Amino acid sequence: MTMHITNLYGAWGTHVLAQQNVAKVARELGFTEMGLYFYPVDSDTGGELRKRLDGITSAVGNGDLVIFQSPSWNALSYDKALLEVIRAHRVKLAIFIHDVITMMFEGAPEEIYPSLIEIYNMADLLIVPSEPMLEFLKEKGLAVGKVLIQPMWDLPFSGELRVPEFQRRIFFSGSLQRFQAISSWNYEIPLRLFGYDEFKGKNPNVHFEGWKNTTELLIEYSKGGFGLIWEQTARPEYYRCNQPHKLCTYLAAGIPVLIQKGLVHERTVREYGLGFVVDSFEEAADMVRNISEEEYYQLVNNIKNISFLIREGFFTKKLLIDTVNYLLLG
């Protein structure tokens, strides 16, 4: 029996990096990569698509185990057709949900959900980002019996990082189009922004520093400060049931976080002393303004162990091993 996992190519962004990080950890556990390419699916005829899918699945044999990282960011019809070809091999199939596209973007038609749930219901096991996401999908018709909840994103990183220094400043990385509330920052605590969107604000304490890759971000974060995690502007409810990639990046760098109340991992941050849960930007700024150096370094010390786990990929390793055990042993 061979274990397979899909991996996405031909696109860029955090969503692609997440799939590639999972596939990297999976390869270390003995999985074979099944490469998918992001492309205009409508350019294929039915016959061309079938040839493409046959090529992608050529290494899959009867009785194998397959983990499909969802979505492929191609059309839903592509995902369904691919899974139908995979299922024809009588495999054990797990679908690892990274994002639910219909929940992410404002104006996404509700009539898409039946097609999406039909795809999810093809799985023998489903990996979901959170309990709230699972309950939402069940309301839409999800019927998969075997489910695992993803604990947290990993960020595999083998480089050396400094111990963060005590700094009264806040970091935020992301699209200012998606997180428009960030533009209203009006406090004396410095806010350092990283992303593609150009920022033109009036507050001299907001510093826009452009896009940086993962390694560059980790180096900047590890110089000291706090990482901010906030809901997106459109469809904010999505951020309340989805895994925030920002969290693992901040923690991998060893810095405390400021997470908006109600988001996934609010409880984790509280219980493990990884930072603060806040209701508003004003409260976040107050926390940074009033914390002592001793209190800051206590938070940094609290983060050491979970930072190690994230950089070594342990959360993903355990999740993948649990997936294999659950599929094969029940």
Give short role names for the model-derived ranges:
Residues 6-20, 44, 72-75:
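A short, glycine/small-residue-rich beta-strand->loop->alpha-helix junction that serves as a flexible
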Residues 16-29, 246:
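Short amphipathic alpha-helix
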Residues 43-135:
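Extended catalytic core of nucleotide-activated donor transferases of GT-like folds
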Residues 124-138, 142-159:
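Donor nucleotide-sugar binding/catalytic pocket of nucleotide-sugar-dependent glycosyltransferases
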Residues 153-220:
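Conserved catalytic-core segment of nucleotide-activated headgroup transferases in glycan assembly
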Residues 215-253, 259-267:
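Nucleotide-sugar-dependent
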Residues 271-278:
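A short acidic/histidine/glycine-rich donor-binding loop in glycosyltransferase catalytic cores
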Residues 279-282, 286, 293-329:
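A charged, aromatic-enriched C-terminal amphipathic alpha-helix characteristic of glycosyltransferases
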